[in-house]
């Protein structure tokens, strides 16, 4: 029995797509094929896929909403698991529990509807709840670490564990999940009671700032670089004269130099080449070495 036949038998009922192009699932609109793209409907299907992959020695990875990643043009070998169907969100008092595939922006709107404050900073951050925990996503002075109460994960060995914020060892755009290989299943956020109008005004203000400053009208991977201590990446790139700098179909945004946008059928290689070139030119200009925030996954073509 071939691996494919065994997969279809053991994982019967689970949505699996073979040699599926990933560009249509990525905010950058680039990326090659996944060998097996899987859409589990719940944590039990997810656990079945992980167990099968481990037994068959097939590599696997989970993607959130693919908002802060670049998938290389050669694609990704093994299983790519998209958890967007694991998207239930519930409210209990001042606590919101969200599954990993829940949309982060929509989760902040649920907090607003229940007049819960603390989540406003994330009202414009694209991506999933699971991805936000993985990266300790943040903006405008807030970050996931500030509001996370606990996190349920599936370990790489297939066990379910509940972790505290301390267990996750949050840092700037970092969590312990990045090293552990665990998969976020669900998250509990501890919020506080607030006034609906005040929360909405703050969310509207932050949304306006984002629309004003960021090139939301183009495909992009979000913030490309981490913020250097004492500096802003976008400012350093701008001061190096790189706004509008382009390689292939990808260019440094004129609107915000911290973003690289796909303006003309760019490729993942265009992104990688532009990122490396910007790092080198900023280093030459300011002496500061930018560190990449965006994750680059898969194989080159």
From Swiss-Prot:
One of its GO terms (molecular function) is UDP-N-acetylmuramate dehydrogenase activity. Residues 30-194 form the FAD-binding PCMH-type domain. InterPro entries: FAD-bd_PCMH (IPR016166), FAD-bd_PCMH-like_sf (IPR036318), FAD-bd_PCMH_sub1 (IPR016167), FAD-bd_PCMH_sub2 (IPR016169), MurB (IPR003170), MurB_C (IPR011601), MurB_C_sf (IPR036635), Oxid_FAD_bind_N (IPR006094). Keywords: Cell cycle, Cell division, Cell shape, Cell wall biogenesis/degradation, Cytoplasm, FAD, Flavoprotein, NADP, Oxidoreductase, Peptidoglycan synthesis. It comes from the Bacteria. The keyword Flavoprotein applies. SUPFAM superfamilies: FAD-binding/transporter-associated domain-like, Uridine diphospho-N-Acetylenolpyruvylglucosamine reductase, MurB, C-terminal domain. One of its GO terms (biological process) is cell division. It is found in: Cytoplasm. Its cofactor is FAD. Its EC number is 1.3.1.98. Pathway: Cell wall biogenesis; peptidoglycan biosynthesis. One of its GO terms (cellular component) is cytosol. PANTHER family: UDP-N-ACETYLENOLPYRUVOYLGLUCOSAMINE REDUCTASE. Cell wall formation. This is UDP-N-acetylenolpyruvoylglucosamine reductase. It comes from Streptococcus pneumoniae (strain 70585).
């Amino acid at each position: 029995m071939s691996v494919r036949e065994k997969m279809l038998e053991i994982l019967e009922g689970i949505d699996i797509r073979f040699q599926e192009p990933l560009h249509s699932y990525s905010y950058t609109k680039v990326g090659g094929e996944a060998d097996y793209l899987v859409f589990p409907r719940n944590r039990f299907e997810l656990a079945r896929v992980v167990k099968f992959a481990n037994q068959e020695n097939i590599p696997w990875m989970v993607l959130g909403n693919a908002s802060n990643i670049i998938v290389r043009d050669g694609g990704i070998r093994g299983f790519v698991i998209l958890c967007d169907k694991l998207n239930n969100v519930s409210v209990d008092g001042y606590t919101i529990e969200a599954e990993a595939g829940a949309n982060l922006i929509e989760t902040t709107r649920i907090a607003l509807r229940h007049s819960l404050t603390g989540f406003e900073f994330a009202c414009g951050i694209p991506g999933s709840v699971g991805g936000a925990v993985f990266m300790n996503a943040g903006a405008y002075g807030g970050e996931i670490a500030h509001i996370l109460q606990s996190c349920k994960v599936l370990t790489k060995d297939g066990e379910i564990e509940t972790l505290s914020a301390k267990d996750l060892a949050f840092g700037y755009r970092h969590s312990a999940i990045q090293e552990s290989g665990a998969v976020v299943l669900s998250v509990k956020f501890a919020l506080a009671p607030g006034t609906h109008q005040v929360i909405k005004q703050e969310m509207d203000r932050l949304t306006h700032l984002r629309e004003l400053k960021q090139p939301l009208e183009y495909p992009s991977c979000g913030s490309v670089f981490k913020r250097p201590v004492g500096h802003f990446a976008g400012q350093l790139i701008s001061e190096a004269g790189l706004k509008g700098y382009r390689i292939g179909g990808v260019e440094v945004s004129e609107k915000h130099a911290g973003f690289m946008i796909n303006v003309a059928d760019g490729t993942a290689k265009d992104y990688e080449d532009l990122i490396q070139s910007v790092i080198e030119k900023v280093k030459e200009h300011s002496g500061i070495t930018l560190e990449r925030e965006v994750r680059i996954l898969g194989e080159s073509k």
